[in-house]
UniProtKB/Swiss-Prot annotation:
Protein source organism: Treponema denticola (strain ATCC 35405 / DSM 14222 / CIP 103919 / JCM 8153 / KCTC 15104)
Protein name, UniProt field: Glutamate mutase sigma subunit
Reactions catalysed according to its record: (2S,3S)-3-methyl-L-aspartate = L-glutamate
Subunit comment: Heterotetramer composed of 2 epsilon subunits (GlmE) and 2 sigma subunits (GlmS). GlmE exists as a homodimer and GlmS as a monomer.
GO MF terms, alphabetically ordered: cobalamin binding; metal ion binding; methylaspartate mutase activity
Gene Ontology process terms (BP): anaerobic glutamate catabolic process; glutamate catabolic process via L-citramalate
InterPro entries membership: Acid_CoA_mut_C, Cobalamin-bd, Cobalamin-bd_sf, GlmS
Keywords for the protein's UniProt record, in alphabetical order: Cobalamin, Cobalt, Isomerase, Metal-binding
EC number(s) stated in the UniProt entry for this protein: 5.4.99.1
HAMAP family cross-referenced by the UniProt entry: Me_Asp_mutase_S (MF_00526)
Cofactor list: adenosylcob(III)alamin
Pathway: Amino-acid degradation; L-glutamate degradation via mesaconate pathway; acetate and pyruvate from L-glutamate: step 1/4
Family recorded in the similarity comment: Belongs to the methylaspartate mutase GlmS subunit family.
Length: 139
């Protein structure tokens, strides 16, 4: 039997939106993933430390208060410096201020090193599908 995909999940920065985080935690766990949920109000270092402690395969960052772009800057570089080079980075939610063209938002987050970038309202099934595609040996 294949090892479960290990995920670190949390809400970055000063964002305290907990309901979506709990829904993601439940849905991903039910789908067979091993989820470490660091909760809300989480700085980048908490994601990195949890990923190191759990030997995570991916970090899933959520943000709903619109400041995700600021909060996520430098995360890829910090992951690399901490020994997590190549860890998959996912981000989703209301990750920028105001209504912006999502193609442009996607480009900016991809340039920051994120592997998957999701707009508000993305079904969790999309993330699950992407996780299985990224880790076919664990599906």
């Amino acid at each position: 039997m294949a090892r479960k995909i290990k995920l670190v999940l949390g809400v970055i920065g000063s964002d305290c939106h907990a309901v979506g985080n709990k829904i993601l935690d439940y849905s991903l766990t039910e789908a067979g993933f091993e989820v470490t949920n660091i909760g809300v109000l989480s700085p980048q270092e908490d994601f990195i430390n949890a990923a190191l402690e759990t030997n995570a395969d991916a970090i899933l960052v959520s943000s709903l208060y619109g400041q995700g772009e600021l909060d996520c800057k430098g995360l890829r570089e910090k992951c690399d410096e901490a020994g997590l080079k190549g860890i998959k980075l996912f981000v989703g939610g209301n990750i920028v201020v105001g209504k912006q063209n999502f193609d442009e938002v996607h480009k900016r987050f991809t340039a920051m090193g994120f592997d998957h970038v999701y707009p508000p309202g993305t079904p969790v099934e999309t993330t699950i599908k992407d996780l299985h595609a990224d880790f076919p040996d664990h599906a």
